[in-house]
Amino acid sequence: MKILVVSHNVFSKTGNMGKTLCSYFENFNKEDLAQFYIHSEVPTVDICENYYRVTDKEMIKSILGFKAGTVLGSNNIDIDRNTSRTDSGGDAKLYQKARKRTPLIYLARNLWWRLGHYNTKKFNAWVDEFNPDCVFFVSGDYAFMYDIALKIAKKKNIPLYISCMDDYYFNNKNANRFLGDFQHKAFMKSVKKAIDYSSALFCICDSMSKDYNKYFNKKCITIHTAASFGSQLAANKTNQISYIGNLGYNRHLQLVDIGKELKKFDLAVNHIDVYSSEIREEILKYMIDENGIVFHGSIPADEVKKVMAESLAVIHTESFDENMKNSVKYSVSTKIADSLMSGTCILAYGPEEIASIKYLSDNDAAICINSKDDLKTGLEELLNDEKRRNEVINNAVNLAKKNHLPGTAGDIIKEVLKENA
């Protein structure tokens, strides 16, 4: 069965979304996969060798008559890159503006994708040559991507499957802003059209599957995010507490809480080592020694495993801010699966109602701290109680082997696609 993956991000071994996609399709034949994506990125894995990329810059220029769209193949895969992103300068600034996600940004970006010309003879020839049997759409918070996925599926008269890795439907984070309700209603119109046509939804956690099944009256299947490796990592531990990953959704402020508390202890561990590809100055200004943080920038996937293996603990955190809580309510990232499998103790700092924190807490797979007032006690437990750390590690590894082994997600997807073939 040939699958056309439609997503913002490319298959990658570094970015969170790219890694999750890899875990979904790593056991599929390369010849059965193609991907349409829109970020300024190049693939850094060879899971798929057939790509069509259209960027925002190309779409804006296409309104003025310039051509948009590039076909990429095996010769464009760069496995040695630390990051899949290729934009810089003005292109990077354009992307960062789009990340602010105000109602006007949403409306403007959706508009230029509707006025622009991605749907060219070149694009349609690429789709026809691949001749997919279904579309696998990785959902996001921009209406135009739902429209594109639905248009391809309808034109080819093939099933559409929608993968939901975050909640963009129940939570209108711009509800109190000018045009916020208008923009969200327009977005949900595209969402409902795509979901009504779809054959099934793949959800990131059980709570999302339950809620979406009830709301959309559509079959929902939970796919736990797979770890990027299949067994516990072996390494000598150092006195290092590490955070690896995205600093968005106010996670940087959570790290500041932890870092400042660590500095108060008269111990060998007196800071957090942060590894992230973050470039926003408004976030990086917090990544300083004064806040108990040493910022290292991005590192390649192999080094991520090394850092994770050698750390005394790795951090998972989500913000206590109400708006941020709504935005990440159902989020369970690849990083959590890797952390569970790693054999390193997880320190989870955040509200207990968030799916990821609750999942770790319910399975006693992390030392969980659910309020700032409990930080001191929780960190003392982490640093001073080796027996407790080992107990948490054992629970985490067992949970990873139960739900997050590589290949499990792909097996579930294959089974569902066969049912509807």
Residue positions per predicted region:
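N-terminal subdomain of nucleotide-sugar transferases
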Residues: 1-80, 220, 224, 228, ...
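Conserved catalytic-core segment of nucleotide-activated headgroup transferases in glycan assembly
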Residues: 228-230, 234-286, 295-302
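Conserved acidic donor-binding segment of nucleotide-sugar-dependent glycosyltransferases
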Residues: 333, 351, 363-373, 381-387
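A charged, aromatic-enriched C-terminal amphipathic alpha-helix characteristic of glycosyltransferases
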Residues: 370-373, 386-417
